[in-house]
């Protein structure tokens, strides 16, 4: 693990243009290969002996994922992402298992390690934020920790703005993992338990304070156009988080109608960012998965939850401009988003979707050959229970 982390540092420094001797880069690549082989061997031995340490496997997945991203190896990055996600889904006992799981389908991962340890909240949140659908892993919570976010009196740098938002998002996802299960989706018919209501109000207040401090920072500190674009990206993710935390505990999805202005802002700002990014892409040297996940998530969020047909289609159309090659490119994810919209609208294309037509708990997996995507979703039947929908979509 140490070798892998050292390799990440050396590779990233060389890509940022810092003085990095060739022998250092060669060493880092050599050590990352050693780390990959060693971690793979350890996990294989654990599987063979039925003694999987989920912490080692998860950390190995996230560290090796980072190395593959820096090397531009999308297939390798997705392999590690799917493996880590599979472990978390197995532990949380939530939703369908993704392809590429570590171990056979009927294998139960060892629970010798405490799955609710505070120190692994960040790792679990990382897998949520790396998935396009932002899978919540409900049930894997921090065992009572409030996961207090960081919010300074004022922001001096854009890094401080980003780090503060990241800490608030981490706190939000830990809160949702602990309290976001179906039995607490009772608003507006019933009040939330006091402990949940207090945590919710505290998070909402923190988000609002962050937004206020961001506005001051933009007015007093931002001078360069590039920094203004980076700040816009953070603003989009704030808007998504604000809608998410404000709707988590509602019994039906009609509540999203109260956030049409936020959905509109998300789409409009995302369009500006993507247009700027596409103009600069030819000279960009930044390593990334082929789908620019920072902008794909907000657009997928709008297509998934908004009921306004025109806004949903604007989001899908712009999503097609995000990324052009590889497995998880904008066009393939847009096909999935379009299927969601068409399935919900049925014969009423372009109109607001009725509650009984909404899809729930949507997850998807794009196959390694990038030709087919498997989509899972739930849909309420006349008895109020969820029927599972399983659909395979052709992507070409």
Question: What residue spans do the PLM features occupy?
Answer:
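Specific register positions within alpha-helical solenoid repeats of the TPR/Sel1-like families, i.e.
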Residues: 10-14, 69, 132, 243-248, ...
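Long, well-ordered mid-to-C-terminal structural blocks that present hydrophobic/aromatic surfaces
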Residues: 197-266
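Alpha-helical solenoid repeat scaffolds, predominantly canonical TPR units
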Residues: 31, 38, 80, 262, ...
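Intrinsically disordered, low-complexity regulatory regions with latent secondary structure
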Residues: 101-162, 209, 320-396
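Intrinsically disordered, low-complexity acidic/Ser/Thr-rich segments used as protein-protein interaction/activation
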Residues: 3-11, 16-198, 219-231, 285-288
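Amphipathic alpha-helical protein-interaction segments enriched in hydrophobic
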Residues: 53-61, 225-248, 284-308, 312-313, ...
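Structured C-terminal portions of repeat-based eukaryotic scaffold domains
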Residues: 253-302
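Alpha-helical solenoid scaffolds that mediate protein-protein interactions
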Residues: 28, 35, 42, 84, ...
